[in-house]
């Protein structure tokens, strides 16, 4: 008998992966956590039936959420990561010797524990001495912080369930306050393709625009996320990622599977239908 993992992207669209075995299934105080093993995508884990990370394509997401802001401002030293319980975002950040401190705030400790056991590919740098783990609500955490971070990365789940509060005007305003005068905020911005995800994307973009003077959106192709077309938000008090001297990033000699400085320039060139959505967020 064949075992398939099937995820509902809309009420009329489903995405399936053939599974060899289910490695873990459990429920925390916040969500259901499942880990599967597959031939095509390796080990992958889901939260409440939604894909979070696969061994095969996680490099795309983590490259793009980390290296775009790091190339824009190579002097980043103090970073806050909200969410990111799989550890992949922290893994990429620890590759920068110039970063002195990484605070990671994850609401669900069980996510981290499960990923440490089943996804060492992403979780293998959570014990880096520069990393401090806080198992609490990121929304509450940023309320008490002011003028502290050079970069905040919001590596959250979708804008419903435990991650819902990370898409509010209050949250983005508190992130602005928590950043230094030249600080950068990057967040996963959902997909523009399916209607429900596009609504979440437009709502997030509208609220970020109300807080930050520099506000851009960039994209990547992530095969296991709904539609495969995924967006990221880039907001800053000072730096425009299209005007920064990003070629200096190449001097670091970091080996990446997805990100490069040519792609950095190109990923901000959006399709017309996405441009129109972003232009009309106030309607």
Swiss-Prot record:
Reaction equations catalysed: S-adenosyl 3-(methylsulfanyl)propylamine + putrescine = S-methyl-5'-thioadenosine + spermidine + H(+)
Listed GO CC annotations: cytosol
Positions of S-methyl-5'-thioadenosine binding: 31, 106, 137-138, 162
Signal peptide start-end: none
Similarity section: Belongs to the spermidine/spermine synthase family.
UniProt: spermidine binding residues: 62, 86, 155-158
Protein name: Polyamine aminopropyltransferase
Enzyme class (EC, first level): transferase
InterPro entries: PABS (IPR030374), SAM-dependent_MTases_sf (IPR029063), Spermi_synthase (IPR001045), Spermidine_synt_N (IPR035246), Spermidine_synt_N_sf (IPR037163)
GO molecular function: spermidine synthase activity
Function: Catalyzes the irreversible transfer of a propylamine group from the amino donor S-adenosylmethioninamine (decarboxy-AdoMet) to putrescine (1,4-diaminobutane) to yield spermidine.
GO BP annotation list: spermidine biosynthetic process
Known EC number: 2.5.1.16
Record keywords: Cytoplasm, Polyamine biosynthesis, Spermidine biosynthesis, Transferase
Superkingdom of source: Bacteria
Organism annotation: Clostridium perfringens (strain 13 / Type A)
Pathway per the UniProt entry: Amine and polyamine biosynthesis; spermidine biosynthesis; spermidine from putrescine: step 1/1
Domain PABS: 2-237
Residues annotated as the enzyme's active site: 155
Localisation per UniProt entry: Cytoplasm
């Amino acid at each position: 008998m064949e075992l398939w993992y099937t995820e509902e992207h809309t009420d009329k669209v489903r995405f399936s992966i053939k599974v060899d075995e289910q490695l873990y299934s459990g429920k925390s105080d916040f969500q259901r956590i499942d880990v599967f093993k597959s031939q095509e995508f390796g080990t992958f884990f889901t939260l409440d039936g939604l894909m979070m990370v696969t061994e095969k394509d996680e490099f795309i997401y983590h490259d793009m959420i980390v290296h775009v802001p790091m190339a824009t401002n190579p002097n980043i030293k103090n970073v806050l990561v909200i969410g990111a319980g799989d550890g992949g975002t922290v893994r990429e950040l620890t590759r920068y010797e110039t970063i002195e401190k990484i605070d990671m705030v994850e609401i669900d400790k069980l996510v981290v524990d499960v990923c440490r056991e089943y996804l060492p590919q992403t979780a293998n740098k959570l014990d880096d001495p520069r990393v401090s783990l806080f198992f609490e609500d990121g929304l509450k955490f940023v309320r008490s912080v002011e003028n502290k971070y050079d970069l905040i990365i919001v590596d959250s789940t979708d804008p419903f369930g435990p991650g819902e509060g990370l898409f509010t005007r209050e949250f983005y305003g508190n992130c602005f306050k928590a950043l230094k005068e030249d600080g950068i905020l990057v967040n996963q911005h959902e997909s523009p393709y399916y209607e429900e995800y596009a609504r979440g994307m437009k709502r997030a973009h509208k609220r970020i625009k109300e807080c930050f003077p520099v506000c851009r959106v960039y994209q990547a192709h992530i095969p296991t996320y709904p539609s495969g077309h995924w967006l990221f938000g880039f907001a800053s008090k000072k730096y425009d990622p299209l005007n920064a001297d990003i070629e200096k990033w190449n001097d670091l000699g970091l080996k990446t599977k997805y990100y490069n400085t040519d792609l950095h320039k190109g990923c901000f060139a959006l399709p017309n239908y996405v441009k129109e959505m972003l232009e009309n967020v106030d309607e």
